[in-house]
């Protein structure tokens, strides 16, 4: 029996960037399944809890809730018996990248 393919959740409020990220991920990591793509931090938390993906790709600057705030909310709500997914922050803003590293992101 082969292990299940890893599943990912993408949280990106810019549709073109979300599509580009999906395309790049498919090319670089063919076995990765994109479980869902959402456009804001609140939906990211809800979908991550519902789908429990293996990898999260969060834009940092999103409407409603930033990716950083969504990651904190998700960590607080994540089931204790489940391993927390790998978290990758996606940003073009240096100041947010520093904050993400301080939060021990990938």
PLM regions with names:
Residues 1-9:
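Non-catalytic signal-transmission and effector/linker regions of two-component phosphorelay proteins
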Residues 12:
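Conserved acidic carboxylate
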Residues 15-22, 97:
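Charged phosphotransfer/docking patches of two-component systems
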Residues 29-34, 83-85:
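A generic structural motif
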Residues 35-42:
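Conserved Asp/Asn-Gly motif in the active-site loop of CheY-like receiver
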Residues 46, 50-106:
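CheY-like receiver
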């Amino acid at each position: 029996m082969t292990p299940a393919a890893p599943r990912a959740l993408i949280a990106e409020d810019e549709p073109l960037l979300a599509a580009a990220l999906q395309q790049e991920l498919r090319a670089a990591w063919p076995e990765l399944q994109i479980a869902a793509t959402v456009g804001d931090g609140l939906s990211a938390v809800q979908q991550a809890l519902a789908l429990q993906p293996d990898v999260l790709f969060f834009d940092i600057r999103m409407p409603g809730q930033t990716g950083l705030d969504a990651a904190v909310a998700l960590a607080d709500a994540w089931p204790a018996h489940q391993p927390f997914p790998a978290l990758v922050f996606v940003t073009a803003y240096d100041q947010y990248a520093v904050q993400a590293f301080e939060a021990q992101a990938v």
